[in-house]
């Protein structure tokens, strides 16, 4: 139902976390589902968590994408994310340790986007949440998938 809705013009954002994508002990089980079908990424079939307690610095891959409009070019460190693989034809907007952090795609008449870290406060620590670019980034992701 969700996949058909997105293809028909709906919007989907999937954020990371312990029970997102494949998640802790692969218990989230999004690999091979209709949800994965409309994502810009493919999920692994095993525990996909990448814990980076030392901090991992996100890299901008598509600075001109609307999701990054008004967002500072340098992001604070993240403490983890879910590892996924970019699908052919999807846009890699930002990455962390070479893995997709923000990716987006058009799906039929709709759009989907992933943010593979969580939204806080676990992998997305307080300095990231308080960073001046956090609110615009989150707002831009919503605006982009909504087609505005």
Task: Name the predicted role of every residue range.
Residues 11-99, 104:
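An acidic, glycine-rich "communication" segment
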Residues 1-17, 30, 34-35, 83-148:
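A glycine-centered loop/beta-turn motif at secondary-structure junctions
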């Amino acid at each position: 139902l969700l996949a058909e809705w997105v293809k028909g013009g709906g919007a989907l954002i999937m954020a990371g976390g312990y029970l997102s994508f494949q998640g802790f002990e692969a218990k989230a089980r999004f690999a091979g589902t209709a949800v994965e079908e409309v994502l810009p990424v493919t999920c692994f079939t095993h525990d996909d968590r990448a814990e980076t307690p030392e901090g991992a610095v996100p890299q901008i891959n598509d600075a001109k994408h609307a999701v990054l409009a008004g967002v500072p070019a340098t992001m604070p460190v993240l403490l983890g994310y879910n590892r996924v693989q970019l699908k052919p034809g999807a846009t890699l907007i930002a990455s962390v340790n070479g893995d997709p952090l923000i990716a987006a795609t058009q799906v039929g008449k709709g759009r989907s986007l992933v943010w593979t870290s969580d939204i806080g406060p676990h992998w997305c620590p307080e300095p990231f949440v308080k960073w001046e670019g956090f609110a615009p980034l989150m707002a831009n992701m919503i605006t982009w998938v909504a087609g505005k």
